[in-house]
Amino acid sequence: VSAWVGLAELALSGCTTSTDHLYLHPRGGGDLLSAEIAAAVYLGMRFHPTRGSMSLSEKDGGLPPDDVVQDDDTILAESEVAVARHHDRSHGAMVRVALAPCSPFSVTRDLMVRSAELAEKLDVRLHTHFAENAEDDDFSLAMFGCRPFEYLRDVGWLSDRTWVAHCVMPNDTEIAELGRAGIGAAHCPSSNLILASGIAPVTALRRAGVHVGLGVDGSSSADSASLWLEARQAMLLAKLRDGAAAADARMALEMATIGGAGCLGRVGEIGSIQVGAVGDVAVWSLEGPRFAGAIADPREAWLRCGPVGARDTIVHGRFVVRDGRLTSPRVAEMLTTHRRLAARMQNPG
C-alpha cells in the first residue's frame, strides 16, 4: 500500500518511471521487493526498484538495529533471486532490478566489492548513497582513510553501470572522474534542503558528463513525492549556487527526463520523445490564472508559474493519470487502507 501511494503521488506530478532504494528487510517482513513491484504493476508505473541491503548493525558499529540487517551471503543470494524473478531485459521493460547496498557506511567492504562483481555478472545496475554531506567525508576519512570517491573507486564501483544518490560533496577532480566513468547521480534537492546537507554541484556534474537525474527521497527526509517540485528546486538551487544564469527550466526538464534515463541506463528508450523510444508522456495544461500572460516560453512558464500537477501521465501508451486524476479503480480504497495502517503505526496504543 505504501509503495502504491508513493508511486501514485509521483504519477500525479508527471513521473512515468521511478526507482526505490529498498534497503531495509526486517526479519519476518516477507518479500517486500515483490510487493512493491506488484504495486507498480497494478498502478501502471514503469519501475526500477533496487534490491538494497544493510549488513552492519549497531553491534558492528553501524546504525540500524540487528533485526533489519542481513549477512553478506544472504544479501547476495537474495539479490540474485530477485534479478532472476523480476528483471526484464527487453526493450521497453516495465520492471528492472538493480543492486543497492545502502551506503559504504552501513555494509561491509566485502559486500560492496561482491555486489559490483555480481552486477557485472548479471548485467544489472548498481546504486548507493554517496557524498551526501560533510559528515560522510569525515566518517570515510576516519573509517577508511580516504574520501568517499576514493572508496567507491577502490571497491570497483567507478563504472557506467553505477548511479549514486545525492552527490553533494565531490571536489572538482572527483567530478571530472565521475564524468569520465559515466556515472549517474540522483539529485535530491528537497531532501538536501530539509537535512541541510548542502547543494549538489549539478552544473559542474552535468558539464563533466555525469548523468544527473532527480530524486524525491523518502518520507524520512522529504515530504512530497513530486518530480515537478524537485525539478523546480533543482533549478533554483543551481541558480543560488552558481549564479542566476547557471540554470533554467530546460536544464531542469532535462534532469527530470533524459538525466533520469541516463541514471537507469536507458537513454534513447525512456526520457525522450523520439523514434524507438517507448510511449511515456506527461502532459501539462498551461491554462488558468497562474499562467495568464506566460506565452513567450512555455518551459519557463511550466516551472515558474506552478505548483501544478500533470493533466495526463501516460506510461507505455496507457493513461495512469487522465484529466488530473488517477485512472486506478481503487484509489479511495487504497488511501483508506493506508490511512488506517499509518494511524496504527503512529499510535500503537
Report the location of each language-model feature.
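Metal-associated gating/positioning segment near the N- to mid-region
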Residues: 1-34
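Divalent metal-coordination and catalytic microenvironments
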Residues: 14, 40, 99, 129, ...
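Metal-coordinating catalytic core of metallo-dependent amide/deamination hydrolases
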Residues: 26-168
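Glycine-enriched alpha-helix->loop->beta-strand junction motifs that scaffold or abut catalytic
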Residues: 44-46, 116-125, 157-160, 177-186, ...
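Histidine/acidic-residue-rich catalytic or RNA/ligand-binding cores of hydrolases
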Residues: 59-60, 134-146, 172-179, 196-205, ...
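His/Asp/Glu-enriched, well-ordered alpha-helical/loop segment
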Residues: 154-161, 203-288, 304-305
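Catalytic beta/alpha-barrel core
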Residues: 162-170, 187-192
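C-terminal cap of metal-dependent C-N hydrolases
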Residues: 278-335
